[in-house]
Every structure is written in structure tokens, then in C-alpha cells.
Design a protein with these regions (language model features):
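Small-residue-biased structural context
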Residues: 3-184
Length: 184
């Protein structure tokens, strides 16, 4: 996610349903992982805009609604997504494409730092909710977005590798596991 101030994005136009999947189902688990990344990009775009928006408009209802949606995604869906990768996709990928081991190891390390970056952003969100005059730490927001920029650039080529090397029936199996994870 690269935030370009010249683009005409506004926080008002980017609120979204965090569970929208554009007709992708767990029958296509790699497409579902990509769909999650689409949400991550959109939410990171919102996080990237927050500091400037708040400086210009204050912490209004739009900001509060936006941070609640972002928090819902990163508190609920993102940990499930990481679990899908760590417990299902990465191990299966390594069975069929062991050359991905170095990238998988790096991504697993990054999952830890991404969670830490989220904790810092969530703390800023909590302060904003408690005190609408609070000025959030823009650096925490930048670290969060930058962490995902790097992460997605390494991870998505592995999704393509999975499409190439993992048999369809194995993908179907992990898709069922991923769907069941969300029903528990």
C-alpha cells in the first residue's frame, strides 16, 4: 500500500464492510487470502490518511466510525488470516514448493512485528476514542502501513506459487479448514 496524497481519497469514501469478499469463497482459499489482502490495503490506506484528516477536521464521527471498522478487521479477521497462513497455507506450500522456505520464515517473523504494530495503532485508537482532542502518533500509523507494504510484497508471490504447485484437492481441503476456523 502506497499512500499518494495526490489521489483524491477521503476517509468518508473508504468506509467499508470489513467482511465483504466480492463473491470469493473458501472453496478458493488462495483467492480468499488475496481478498483479505485487498481489505488490508484499503484499511491501511485509511490509517495512512488518519493523521492528516484529524489535523484538518478533528476527531469527528467519521473518524470514530472508521477506526472502529479498522479495529474490527485487525482484531478479528487479520488474526484468523494469519492463522490460515501459518497453520494451513504455508505448511502445504512447503510440501510442494520447498524453495519458498526462506520467504515463509521471513513472513512468520513479520507476523510477530505486524501484531506489535497493530497493538500500537490500537492503543492510539483507544486514546482517540477516550479523548477526541488527542493527537495520535503519526509514526505508529506509518510503521503499521509500512510493515504491511513489505509483508504483502513478499507474501503474494507465494500465493501465486501455491496456485502453481499445490494440487487443487489439497487447496480444497485447506479451504474447508479455513471456513471451519471462522465458525468456531
Amino acid at each position: 500500500v502506497e499512500y499518494r496524497p495526490s489521489e483524491k481519497y477521503t476517509i468518508e469514501n473508504t468506509t467499508m464492510n470489513p467482511f465483504e469478499t466480492k463473491s470469493v469463497t473458501f472453496a478458493e482459499p488462495i483467492e480468499m487470502l488475496y481478498a483479505c489482502h485487498g481489505k488490508v490495503r484499503r484499511f491501511c490506506g485509511q490509517v495512512a490518511m488518519l493523521s492528516d484528516y484529524i489535523a484538518e477536521n478533528g476527531c469527528n464521527q467519521i473518524v470514530l466510525q472508521t477506526i472502529r471498522q479498522i479495529a474490527q478487521y485487525f482484531n478479528v479477521a487479520a488474526p484468523l488470516h494469519h492463522e490460515d497462513e501459518e497453520e494451513n497455507f504455508f505448511p502445504l506450500l512447503l510440501q510442494y514448493a520447498p524453495q519458498a522456505q526462506e520467504s515463509v520464515n521471513e513472513l512468520l517473523r513479520q507476523h510477530v512485528s505486524l501484531h506489535g504494530n497493530w497493538d500500537a495503532v490500537a492503543a492510539e485508537f483507544a486514546k482517540l476514542e477516550a479523548d477526541n482532542a488527542y493527537v495520535p502518533d503519526a509514526e505508529a500509523f506509518k510503521r503499521f502501513v509500512a510493515g504491511y507494504d513489505v509483508h504483502l510484497a513478499i507474501e503474494e508471490p507465494l500465493f501465486d506459487m501455491g496456485k502453481t504447485f499445490i494440487p487443487k484437492e489439497k487447496l480444497t481441503e485447506i479451504g474447508e479448514i479455513m471456513a471451519a476456523r471462522r465458525r468456531r
